[in-house]
Each structure stands twice: as structure tokens, then as C-alpha cells.
A protein has these predicted regions:
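Bacterial Sec-dependent N-terminal signal peptides
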Residues: 1-23
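Interaction-mediating elements
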Residues: 22-148
Length: 148
């Protein structure tokens, strides 16, 4: 009997932890239905993933996939209009000119995330997190700007 009660307690604890993790991000951010629906319509594969939501500059950002849960990061307006998707990529997939720029201007820099960005107009760019800032490059790897 003690074993059954012990197992029940352990299973309850594990299921509570799992439930809390599934709702992580939703407790702090109330995502409009229009935004959730837009994400499911545009990226139906995300339905099978654990999605975390956050707000950024008045918009909503859905994150899912990969080890850190942020292999895909999609931004929508509050009305559910697609703004952009950032897909995590390895550094070696950056255009050569972007890599060259980074080596020249950010010697011994600490790299963070590297992503390929596709915006609502179909324009591709790249962003590289370096020393806590986003360094933006165009589709050819030419430096565009640095964002905080």
C-alpha cells in the first residue's frame, strides 16, 4: 500500500511539472485567438510542438522547435498579421561576406543565436546575436545595422 501511495505521489508530481511547463509563457502572455489561429494556419507543423509565447515591441512571438525551443521564432501583430519568421541556422550557413564582416568587426566576440529571417514581403536577411546585440545582414551578407 505504501508503494502504491508513493508511486501515485511521484506520478502526480511529474504530471504537475509537465503541465506547468506546457503552460509556461501562457501565464505571462495572453495571446489573442486571432494570433494563435494565424500561426496554426501558416505553420501547421507547429501544432505538434510545444509553443512558448512572448511579446516584443507590441507584437506576439511564437517560439518552438530545436533544443532550446526557439528553432523557429514567428512574429505577428495583435491582429494576427504575419511580420516575420526567424529560423535558427548554423554559423556556417551565413553568407561569406557576413562571416567576413563579423571576423573583421567582432574579433573575440561572444556569439549567440544565428538566424535566417523571412519577412512578410518575402525578403530574406540574417541576424546574428553578438555580445547581446543583433547584427543584421541582407540576403547577400552585407551589413545593414545593429539593434539593441
Amino acid at each position: 500500500m505504501k508503494k502504491i501511495l508513493g508511486l501515485t505521489a511521484i506520478l502526480f508530481a511529474l504530471s504537475s511539472t509537465t503541465f506547468a511547463q506546457e503552460n509556461e509563457g501562457h501565464e505571462k502572455v495572453k495571446v489573442p485567438t486571432s494570433v494563435k489561429n494565424a500561426n496554426m494556419q501558416k505553420y501547421p507543423e507547429s501544432k505538434k510542438q510545444h509553443i512558448t509565447w512572448e511579446t516584443e515591441k507590441g507584437n506576439y512571438e511564437a517560439n518552438w522547435g530545436g533544443r532550446d525551443g526557439e528553432a523557429n521564432s514567428v512574429t505577428y501583430t495583435p491582429a494576427g498579421t504575419f511580420v516575420e519568421i526567424v529560423k535558427a541556422i548554423p554559423v556556417k550557413e551565413l553568407p561569406a561576406s557576413a562571416s567576413s564582416y563579423i571576423k573583421t568587426h567582432y574579433k573575440k566576440a561572444k556569439f549567440g543565436d544565428v538566424g535566417r529571417v523571412l519577412d512578410a514581403k518575402g525578403v530574406t536577411s540574417y541576424e546574428v546575436e553578438i555580445n547581446g546585440k543583433d547584427v543584421i545582414f541582407d540576403k547577400d551578407g552585407n551589413f545593414v545595422k545593429t539593434e539593441m
